Amino acid sequence: RQQGKMMHPAFRKPLYQDVTAVYADSLNRDLVVSSDILCKEVHRGDIVYFCLSTRMDWVPIAWTVFEEDSLRFQDTEGSVIGCLATWNGKRLVMQSEPFTYDKMSGTIALLTPQSEKEDITLYFKFPLFCDLGILRMPGGVFEGSNDSQFRSADTLYYVKQWPFRLNNTIFPEKEKSYRYVRYKGPKGSYCNIAEMAFFEDTSDTLALKGRIIGTPGCFQKDGSHDYYKVYDSNPYTYMDYKTPDEGWVGLDFGIPRRIKKFTYIPRNSDNFIHKGDVYELFYWHDKKWNSLGRQVAKADSLNYVIPKGVALFLKNHTEGKDERIFKKTDGRQQFW
């Protein structure tokens, strides 16, 4: 108990120690929040909890006693979306709108619904920086050649940044014909790639056929992730070359073919939008998640109209558990 009030169970274990300061080091700071963001039912002397989201729930990670015009939570680190709450002895009662907490500056910004609406296109339900296969793609290159050893090759596309969707379509600038095409993974990538296909015209839906070529062998040493997996029509299997460097996979068309379009799918953890799955988008307001409707994905993206300035959560009702709170920033999803 604290000042006659019951503490949340997470803080009742006397041998627990907060080690935030040890790991956060110079980024460790006290979070200071103005009491203006609290709901009216919070009074002086009440214990207030700083909470982080875990899927659609909130978990307290720090507490303080509300005494003055602001609340101070000791030993915290930013780069999160948080929310304030009280404990009624049975459950947490959320007492603020969510807010972003910046790691570098320590500033917070409320995520409050605005009257103005805006469109958002969703491509995934979990942050890409948690997906190893996505991180390994920048620096990879798609090439075309008429030499089977690719000693003289043209660059069709150089991967500069993380692919942000499942199906990525590229239109090469070069108007040439090639007998051989390939994807060569960057150093340290094990040539991770799930699928790719080449097309003779931009309007084609039927991919060119050819003999699968590439560097044999996989990290698992059992053939389960060899280069031919890139052409098994399964977006969730992938090539995983036996060494970090020099892996590649491609096609021999038999004769030179013009390439006006190609598509690729990165190695992924199945957190992109999955065609046929049922999704529901929520936004937080008035102490709860509010539904913006369910959709059956018709492709690898979803389109919604949302209130500006809100915290969002995308739920896959068909499968999977990897889901995380996010907001719209510069037109794209930003996860916290």
Segments predicted by a language model, with ranges:
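Surface-exposed loop/edge segments in extracytoplasmic proteins
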Residues: 55-63, 91-95, 148-158, 204-208, ...
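Disordered, acidic Ser/Thr/Pro-rich linker "stalks" and the adjacent N-terminal cap
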Residues: 7, 13, 96-177, 189-257, ...
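Coil residues (strongly favoring Ser/Thr
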Residues: 19, 26, 47, 70, ...
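Structural motif
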Residues: 24-47, 55, 128-132, 268
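Short Pro-Gly-centered beta-turn/loop motif in secreted/extracellular proteins
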Residues: 66-81, 87-88, 175-177
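Noncatalytic modules at the cell exterior or secretory-pathway interfaces
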Residues: 79, 173-185, 305-319
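Beta-strand-rich domain onsets/edges
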Residues: 2-32
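Short amphipathic beta-strand segments in non-cytosolic proteins
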Residues: 45-65, 143-147, 153-159, 269, ...
